């Protein structure tokens, strides 16, 4: 799916009082805002009756049965921001997997005012919130997922990531964290996990052959990879290094820890006198908080440690992780 740029195909028409959004031939009514961050706003919308055969033809297999969706609106102020949005659209179109959030439609339009363009990205809506939302709620209630749910959520996340790592060339998500994992719950079933936000995704393998290249990578990571989940080699990159998809494996280990304990594994350092998040991560200084009673199996803790190796070469690949998680699921 290419990036269409049209002044007519996407419009947030506040003047009419209807609060409607057009994306190509499809029209949506804004229900309410459900999120925001930076220059992006996320709205819950409901699709109005399709008006044309073209609109019907654009409908995808992921389209909502009840007509509700999420629309992400991005305000674009520079060519760099425009390029980033176009890249997010391009990368999102590469992947199709049940555990990766699909981009259903999009439009980028030129506008007048304080910014140059607006982008509208259409997604399925997941009202169960993110793992981060769930973790905060569970932390306040001192609740924990049972071991079986931990493993099922984590396995689904691994399946989505494997799809990206198996692409040719392999892609890294670069921002795996609880806030980018949507959760869907059905009564009597384990939660379903869906990985989202491909704005930081890039080809995973990169050769670093100078101090300048190492610093460029660190600067890029500081902007695009959330600090508590960022791999050590993205904090302090050697002048000669081969970066690969195992940066995601570190983030995956941090996320498994957060699924278990409702907190990230290294942010404890921020609450210590003289503590440093970077040093805790680079040195792999892991601490275990109080958990459920009875506690999680020691094998699950060792699974986390396996992924949180400061040296990338010591970390497993995604196929190894899936083999191991299946063994744990069989056991627990």
Question: Can you say where each PLM-predicted feature lies in the sequence?
Answer:
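Protein kinase glycine-rich loop
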Residues: 31-38, 42
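Short beta-strand micro-motifs within the conserved protein kinase catalytic domain, predominantly
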Residues: 102-117
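Conserved short submotifs of the Hanks-type protein kinase catalytic core
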Residues: 114-130
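Catalytic-loop of the protein kinase fold
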Residues: 165-185
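Activation segment/activation loop of eukaryotic-type protein kinase catalytic domains
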Residues: 179-226
């Amino acid at each position: 799916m290419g990036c269409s740029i049209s002044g007519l195909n996407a419009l947030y028409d506040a003047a009419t009082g209807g609060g409607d959004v057009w994306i190509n031939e499809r029209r949506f009514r804004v229900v309410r805002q459900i999120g925001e961050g930076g220059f992006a706003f996320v709205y819950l919308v409901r699709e109005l009756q399709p008006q044309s055969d073209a609109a019907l033809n654009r409908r995808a297999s992921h389209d909502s049965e009840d007509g509700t969706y999420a629309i992400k609106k991005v305000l674009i102020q520079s060519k760099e921001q425009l390029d980033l949005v176009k890249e997010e659209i391009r990368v999102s179109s590469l992947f199709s997997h049940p555990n990766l959030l699909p981009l259903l439609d999009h439009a980028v339009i030129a506008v007048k005012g304080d910014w140059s363009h607006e982008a509208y990205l259409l997604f399925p809506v997941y009202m169960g919130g993110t793992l981060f939302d769930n973790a905060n709620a569970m932390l306040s209630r001192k609740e924990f997922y049972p071991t079986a749910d931990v493993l099922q959520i984590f396995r689904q996340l691994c399946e989505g990531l494997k799809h990206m790592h198996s692409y040719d060339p392999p892609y890294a998500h670069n921002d795996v964290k609880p806030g980018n994992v949507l959760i869907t719950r059905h009564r009597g079933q384990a939660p379903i996990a869906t990985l989202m936000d491909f704005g930081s995704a890039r080809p995973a393998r990169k050769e670093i052959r100078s101090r300048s290249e190492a610093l460029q990578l660190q600067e890029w990571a500081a902007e695009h990879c959330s600090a508590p989940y960022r791999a050590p080699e993205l904090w302090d990159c050697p002048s000669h290094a081969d970066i690969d998809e195992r940066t995601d494996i570190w983030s995956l280990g941090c996320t498994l820890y957060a699924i278990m304990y409702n907190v990230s594994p290294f942010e404890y350092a921020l609450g210590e006198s003289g503590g440093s998040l970077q040093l805790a991560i680079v040195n792999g200084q892991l601490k275990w908080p109080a958990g459920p009673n009875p506690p999680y199996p020691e094998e699950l803790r060792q699974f986390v440690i396996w992924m949180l190796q400061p040296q990338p070469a010591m970390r497993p690949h995604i196929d190894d992780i899936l083999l191991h998680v299946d063994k744990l699921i069989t056991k627990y």
